[in-house]
């Protein structure tokens, strides 16, 4: 079960960092494709 917890923490941390960078810099690609 520990591996599951560590994996969840890793994915959540990467997700937070990705969203932080994505919202910090203006997306150069039109986001109309993403609904």
From Swiss-Prot:
Quote the subunit structure annotation.
Answer: PSII is composed of 1 copy each of membrane proteins PsbA, PsbB, PsbC, PsbD, PsbE, PsbF, PsbH, PsbI, PsbJ, PsbK, PsbL, PsbM, PsbT, PsbY, PsbZ, Psb30/Ycf12, at least 3 peripheral proteins of the oxygen-evolving complex and a large number of cofactors. It forms dimeric complexes.
Sorted alphabetically, the keyword list is: Chloroplast, Membrane, Photosynthesis, Photosystem II, Plastid, Thylakoid, Transmembrane, Transmembrane helix
Q: Which family does it belong to?
A: Belongs to the PsbT family.
Location in the cell reads: Plastid, Chloroplast thylakoid membrane
Name the residues that span the membrane.
Answer: 3-23
- Known InterPro entries for this protein? PSII_PsbT, PSII_PsbT_sf
State the membrane topology. Single-pass membrane protein
Top-rank taxon: Eukaryota
A GO cellular-component term linked to this record:
photosystem II reaction center
Q: Which gene encodes it?
A: psbT
Q: Which SUPFAM superfamilies match?
A: Photosystem II reaction center protein T, PsbT (SSF161029)
Protein name listed in UniProt:
Photosystem II reaction center protein T
- Reported function: Found at the monomer-monomer interface of the photosystem II (PS II) dimer, plays a role in assembly and dimerization of PSII. PSII is a light-driven water plastoquinone oxidoreductase, using light energy to abstract electrons from H(2)O, generating a proton gradient subsequently used for ATP formation.
Q: What is the predominant subcellular site recorded for this chain?
A: plastid
Quote any Pfam family the record assigns: PsbT
* GO terms for biological process, alphabetical: photosynthesis
Provide the species name: Magnolia tripetala
Among HAMAP family, the record links this protein to:
PSII_PsbT (MF_00808)
């Amino acid at each position: 079960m520990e591996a599951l917890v560590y994996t969840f923490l890793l994915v959540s941390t990467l997700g937070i960092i990705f969203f932080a960078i994505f919202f910090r810099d203006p997306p150069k690609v039109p986001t109309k494709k993403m609904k």
